Amino acid sequence: MRVASFESKGIEKVGVFYKGKLIDIDLVSEIIGHKLDKEFPAFFNVVDIIEQWEYVEKLIEKGEKLFKSEFLKFFEVKNPLLTAPIIRESKIVCLGKNYAEHAKETGSKPPEEPIIFGKFADCVISHDEEIIYPDFATRVDPEVELAVVIGKQGKDVDAEEAMDYVFGYTIANDITERELEYADMKKGWPWFRSKNFDAAMPLGPWIVTKDEIPNPHNLEIELSVN
């Protein structure tokens, strides 16, 4: 299943794609709760969906039983304006030189230990928003990445258990001001200024749950410029 954030009448909302249609899961919860005289959780953002995923599946099942063939018609979001599937409080942890081919492009080998850096969540824009270059930019490069969405809190997780913490996947574009990055690297400085400016992280358009991608190591990611 796919999880998406969208804007409706100026309000940020969240939904899931079911049978090819985006449905407003918060509205589903509200209406079904009213019909059954039960209290179901509210869903305001993607974190609510991730943390209460078992309710999402139950609500869809109950909705199909109650509304039958009218379910999708009643709850479908028409012409949605998709926004980045993230909340501003999210943590974005990135890996440098994580693709062997990309490492070769830089003239180096893939590192034995992960090279970790971070990006601020307020750098994120939706997948089809315009990327505005900062005034100081001389060379801006796109870097398309597979983004792994962590679904629950963990610490000191063993490698064998790591996938238990994954909720799903989306696509990220790690926009980088390359000349600034190289200049900072020569000084031994971190990759911070070159990767943390407004609009430096297009993300989305949605999150695909991990059950739909049994082998995330066998995916093709493609990016085109202009």
Question: Where do the language-model regions lie?
Answer:
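N-terminal non-catalytic cap/leader segment that marks the start of a structured domain
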Residues: 1-114, 212-214, 222
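Glycine-enriched loop-and-adjacent helix/strand subsegments that border the catalytic/binding cleft
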Residues: 89-226
